[in-house]
Swiss-Prot record:
Record gene name: dxr
Protein residues bound to 1-deoxy-D-xylulose 5-phosphate: K128, S154, E155, S179, H202, S215, N220, K221, E224
Amino acids binding NADPH: T16, G17, S18, I19, A42, R43, N44, N127, E129, G208
Alphabetized SUPFAM superfamilies for the sequence: 1-deoxy-D-xylulose-5-phosphate reductoisomerase, C-terminal domain, Glyceraldehyde-3-phosphate dehydrogenase-like, C-terminal domain, NAD(P)-binding Rossmann-fold domains
Keywords, sorted A to Z: Isoprene biosynthesis, Manganese, Metal-binding, NADP, Oxidoreductase
This protein's name: 1-deoxy-D-xylulose 5-phosphate reductoisomerase
Amino acid sequence: MSPRPEKRRVSIFGATGSIGQNTIDLIARAPEAYDVVALTGARNIAQLAADARRLSASIAVTAEEELLPDLRAALEGSGVEAAAGEAALLEAADRPADWIMSAIVGAAGLAPGFRALRHGTTLALANKESLVTAGPLLLAEAATHGATILPVDSEHSAVFQALVGEDIAAVERIIITASGGGLRDWPEDDLARATPADAGAHPNWDMGQRITIDSASMFNKAMELIETKEFFGVSPARIEAVVHPQSLIHALVGFTDGALMAHLGPPDMRHAIGYALNYPDRAHLPVDRLDLAQIARLEFHAPSDTRYPALKIAREVMQTGGQSGCIFNAAKEIALDGFLAGKIGFMDMSGIVSDTLDAMSSKNSLSNAPETLEDVLQTDQMARNIASARLAR
């Protein structure tokens, strides 16, 4: 193992979101260990500027070009460079860094992640859309340039840790856990009337609104099933999800000898982030320690396809492969926009996704794999247009 630089150069894409803020929390606790190169965000200029000042970042970038004057004003006198727009995000990804957090939500995180891999860096991947929409391309890009991708989702970090030193050929099954979300105790017949406020309250995790609603609908878990297939190269038949209300076991890996290895930890994203930040070493993290005697009980049950139709759609997407993951993600994002805007009900989101997949399958074969990032972005836009049209009906 080659020695690390005296200070690790780090960049955080999506710095103002939940993952970004937890990453900043860990970095700020050890300023002697890190040099912050770039922080990026969207509309929360005050937070972006405050963090850039506090961490003495080289550059702060907002994705919103019209907010550049605000960012410049907020950074005046700090010595931190300000920039805005898609080109600026890519330029920030080109800046030399040893470790980059990819936490921009949605398809917007694709291009910066791909650009960073060209420089052979370590990419901590919290942007699950990258693997769902362009998994084979992303992994090929990393291999071509000698880059490392580390998963930051708590479930995939747990699987990754359970597989250290193991032969992937000996893996019989991978089980990722789901809390069930904020509506898990609602009668199934009542789910159709759930509001964004109802679905946006999570019993265990402190996350942003969109991902919390995706947790309630299990679209988040559906994405993670697809992500598991892409990242670990395991066949869909060997990947499953189980509802685990306590959110203390994040994933389990079953082996051909019958052993089942579980990863336990508190529902705190700083654990998965900290593991990726310090990999291959482990560092002390400011997270709660589990008291097994106090926990006393761990529960599991199988999720229902009628309650969580997103899981059924995800299994079909895993079997189909090709561009279906990209379509699934794009339609899911449009459907969530529609739910947040009050245009459709909570249980209508899965219908938008299914309709979009069906509509695009009539245009071409969903199993045709995209060959370039441009192919992915084109498919993404087509799917968004179709899903938006369905939403407008």
